[in-house]
Amino acid sequence: MRDLVKHEQFELEVIDRLQSGRFLANLIFGGGTMLRLCHGLDRYSVGLDFWVTKDMDWPEYYRRLEQYLMQFYKLADSANKHFTILFELKSPQYPRLLKIEIRKETRVIKTDTSIAYSPNSTVQVMMKTVALKDMMKSKIEAFLSRGEVRDAYDIEFLLKRGIPLNADNETLNKLVTGLKKLSKTDFSVKLGTLLDASKRKYYQENKFRILEMHLRDKLKGE
């Protein structure tokens, strides 16, 4: 658990430095780490995910960002790929690598202005984030694409926050089918390692009961 606390401090340190270096102007913070740092998602995640608001000179952006990050960290990996820019940062102050992924595809999505913060850090950063309604859409797409238990967890988290799960009947049925495919190992190991001990037992026993009931109710209503 201490490693995860340190990793959260690492995330905020890097976000703060990206902001100070003016690398976030055209980026939108998304994914599970955004939900945790900006909206209180109660599971751990290990990477920083960004979308873009407009196309950029990617070779130049990558070059500048790489040189900037190398002032502070060792780069375990870095790549300017066709669809994404990737960095893996290593620091002697922190036990884990930190992955940064910037998706080059320009997406028309709604954004909010949010503060990334943690009770484990004194750093706070105001930044553009994916609006929660669009985050719900993204998480549904992700779960249907890769079937990862963490995406289902995030969908239920957003649902409990009052974010509507707007989807057609076909998508609702696919979600129900996907939830049924999740195994005991998904809950005990994959999800269990991302949760505090106090929450692990609940999800092992109840799984995504709230989400499943909501999906059934929506299907009955239609």
Located regions from the model:
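Structured mid-to-C-terminal alpha-helical surface segments
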Residues: 1-27, 38-40, 53-222
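Glycine-rich beta-strand-to-loop/alpha-helix junction loops that act as flexible
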Residues: 29-33
